[in-house]
């Protein structure tokens, strides 16, 4: 019943706040840390409607229509920060970013160095603490850049992450990495996918230049949303118990073999105080139902490129990814409007 009420609220929100005529889009590189430049994509409301182009579109995946480098609409807008999964990129949640921007948000996402499609640097990947810092750096830019600062509502900032991105945004909310907890969990649940990444992601042992404090929270983040997150077992239970930031936990009901939601999303839902979180499982969704939609024939294309990658296009029987995306979008917009 709570979710039904929230959905009704969201429909009212959509009708009263869908003020943008189009979605503007731009890409920048953040160089405030020269050792970790951030390729960043930004979607935003615009009154412009002409000269649309497709982004994130290729033979396998469906893109979205945007207006490149359009003038931002004259107003202030809440902010959503997006974090992609392991070896993903901003295009994975392009569908979500575009829809949220249509509804009056500035949305920004970076390709995390070391764990993105186009950068597999082991040195960068092992700097696990830099992922949440990447998100804080993006917000710093939006709040200080001449182009954006007058358009940002600094009191309304949400962070959303898929898979490893969900793990990233949980740290912004106050979750703290604890190696002993992770080691113990891996002895009980030796998942080769999550436990097998411990070395690469710098979680097996203390890294050079690792911050002494595991608290990477950012008080400017007012809400977080996780989309079938992974590596939840690396968080200390005490830190999850202490989270007060409103948290929406969305999970895939179909286990494709490496991220069972009961041990990942379910773990954080179990330990975050009930008053701080909402938890929903989409029974017909897989881990990849949260990324962009596949075109007809995409499964064959992906399988030919990398055997086994065809699974990226699989959803539950009798359910389309487009339908799942609409459900996910409705739930996220409802949460944003709380």
Task: Describe each model-derived feature in a short phrase.
Residues 296-338:
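Catalytic active-site module of serine/aspartate enzymes centered on a nucleophile-bearing elbow/loop
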Residues 72-76, 88-111:
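Short amphipathic alpha-helix adjacent to the substrate-entry channel of hydrolases
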Residues 159-161:
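Short beta-strand immediately N-terminal to the catalytic nucleophile in serine-hydrolase-like folds
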Residues 20-81, 261, 298:
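Domain-level recognition of soluble alpha/beta enzyme cores
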Residues 78-85, 111, 251-252:
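The conserved beta1-alpha1 loop
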Residues 87-99, 116-137:
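Catalytic nucleophile-loop/oxyanion-hole region of alpha/beta-hydrolase
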Residues 243, 249-251:
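Short beta-strand/loop motif that positions the catalytic acidic residue
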Residues 124-150, 154, 167, 171, ...:
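Alpha/beta-hydrolase active-site loop
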């Amino acid at each position: 019943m709570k979710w039904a009420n929230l959905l009704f609220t969201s429909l009212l929100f959509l009708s009263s706040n869908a003020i943008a005529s189009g979605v503007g889009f731009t890409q920048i590189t953040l160089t405030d840390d020269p050792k970790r430049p951030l390729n960043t994509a930004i979607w935003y409301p615009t009154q412009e409607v002409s000269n649309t182009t497709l982004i994130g579109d290729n033979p396998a995946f469906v893109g979205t229509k945007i207006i490149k480098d359009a003038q931002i609409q004259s107003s202030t807008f809440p902010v959503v920060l997006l974090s992609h999964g392991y070896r993903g990129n901003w295009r994975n949640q392009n569908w979500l970013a575009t829809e949220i921007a249509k509804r009056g948000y500035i949305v920004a996402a970076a390709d995390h160095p070391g764990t993105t499609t186009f950068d597999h640097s082991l040195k960068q990947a092992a700097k696990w603490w830099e992922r949440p810092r990447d998100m804080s750096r993006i917000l710093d830019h939006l709040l200080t850049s001449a182009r954006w600062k007058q358009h940002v509502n600094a009191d309304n900032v949400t962070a959303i992450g898929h898979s490893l991105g969900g793990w990233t945004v949980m740290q912004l909310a106050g979750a703290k990495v604890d190696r002993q907890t992770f080691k113990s969990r891996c002895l009980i649940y030796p998942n080769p996918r999550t436990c097998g990444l411990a070395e690469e992601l710098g979680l097996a042992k203390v890294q050079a230049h690792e911050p002494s404090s595991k608290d990477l929270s950012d008080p400017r983040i007012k809400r977080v949303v996780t989309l079938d997150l992974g590596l939840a077992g690396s968080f200390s239970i005490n830190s999850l118990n202490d989270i007060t930031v409103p948290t929406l936990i969305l999970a895939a009901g179909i286990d494709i073999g490496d991220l069972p939601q009961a041990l990942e999303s379910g773990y954080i839902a179990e330990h975050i105080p009930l008053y701080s979180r909402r938890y929903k499982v989409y029974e017909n969704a897989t881990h990849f139902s949260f990324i962009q939609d596949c075109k007809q024939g995409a499964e064959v294309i992906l399988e030919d490129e990398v055997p086994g990658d065809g699974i990226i296009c699989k959803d539950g029987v009798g359910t389309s990814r487009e339908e799942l995306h609409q459900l996910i979008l409705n739930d996220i917009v409802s949460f944003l409007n709380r």
